[in-house]
Amino acid sequence: MKKDKIVIIGAGLSGTLLAITMAQRGYQVALYEKRDDMRKVTMSAGRSINLALSPRGMLGLDLAGIRPEILEQCIPMRGRMIHPHGGSSFFQSYSGREGEAINSVSRGGLNIALLNKAESFPNIEMYFNHTCTHAVLEKGIAHFKHEKTGFTVEVKGDILIGTDGSGSALRKSMMDKTADLLFNYSQNFLSHGYKELSIQPTAEGGFKLDKNALHIWPRGSFMIIALPNMDGSFTVTMFHPYEGPYGFNHMNSREEVAAFFQNFYPELIPYMPDYVDEYFNNPTGNLGTVKCYPWQAYGKTLLMGDAAHAIVPFYGQGMNASFEDVRVFNELIDTIGDGDWAGLFNEFQKQRAVNTNAIADLAIDNFYEMRDRVDDADFMLKRKIETDLEFTYPDYYSKYSLVTFRPDIPYSRAMHQGRAQDELLLNWCKGGQPELTKSEMHAQLMDLSKKFENGN
């Protein structure tokens, strides 16, 4: 057993996975969480946004050896089912390759599986209802308040890692040292928020919509999406602006909400008899992006996951990026060693920040794509060409596929290469390029891919 004690703040998805991997390496791990043990309490409605598990996240689960267990809790989604306003629904495949899909999984179910795995390690101690109030960064000390007793406790570790989410207390302690650390921080909210509703199963426990698709009802400045759950239900999420006649701040009566759905989503009403009650009972959540740098302080303290790089959910990569943090951190321990935490932390932040900044930007891009463009003629033609190319030439990957199905390619390269590919494809779709055969088109795209592979 190694002597170093690792204190991890935040027993969410990435924090618990990190604790497991550090315990596997023989470290003493103390894992602190401000909430109750979710295995012993009922989860509140309206905050559960389903997660999309893809290969980057699966590689993280492999570290804990629980990929098979989690996949049993997943429903594969092979593409988007688009429901235009007043038009016929149509399907857009995520990939032209056989078997590629993203997986709808419950955040709570996944977190519980990770907590159960963590509990099996004698060298992991878990403390719930402990809120971090502040940290002494250079000493690896964190101060906690017990939410039920009010007692305070000081905890010292050889290193201190914050996986405590977008409102990270550890990050706030780093911000208090802005001048010393040259700490840069930005937080940008969309003018939209989200609210969750639900589609319940049929009386027989079946699905009312195609279960193997992510459903989107795009309506210009707002949209609804729905993801399947194992029990036959769908988690339905409204993404709306706060302001404007159909904004969350202005639809304040049952009559207004009912009239709005009758106008924009009449086909959903039969599936959701309680939608008005859910609209008023469930909270409205904000959608924001957090970027910061550096992620480490004094070689004793490190940020990881949403604490370092919270993103909006529109690429389905928030959890996957955080699990990738854990994987890269473990790979660096293998290559660099753990004798020099400061050097390890520095290399980790250098490798990860450029990539998490990229997926943050891509997630914003995808918000506008899902809301405004999924039923646009040029976009639909581009997607048709992409999936046809992927079917015929499996070595070609669209921007979406580079991000989602190629964990060997960093997010930054996927973003730059994918944008360059999109530019070429959209030019072809709009007639800005001479007509090409499929093989000529593939050859040009592969030349482009080679340039990015070589770092050009």
Residue locations for each model-derived region?
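Conserved FAD-binding catalytic core of PHBH/FMO-like flavoproteins
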Residues: N116, H130-H134, K139-L287, K291-A297
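C-terminal helical "tail/cap" subdomain of flavin- and related membrane-associated enzymes
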Residues: K2, E331-N456
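Conserved Rossmann-like nucleotide-cofactor binding loop
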Residues: S14, D37, G167
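Glycine-rich FAD pyrophosphate-binding loop
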Residues: A23-G46
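Beta1/beta-strand and adjacent pyrophosphate-binding region of the FAD-binding site
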Residues: K2-S14
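Conserved hydrophobic helix-helix packing surfaces used for dimerization/oligomerization
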Residues: I6-I8, V29, T301
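Conserved mid-domain beta->alpha element of the FAD-binding
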Residues: A11-I20, Q24, G162, L197, ...
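Conserved N-terminal helical subregion
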Residues: K2-K5, S54-E196
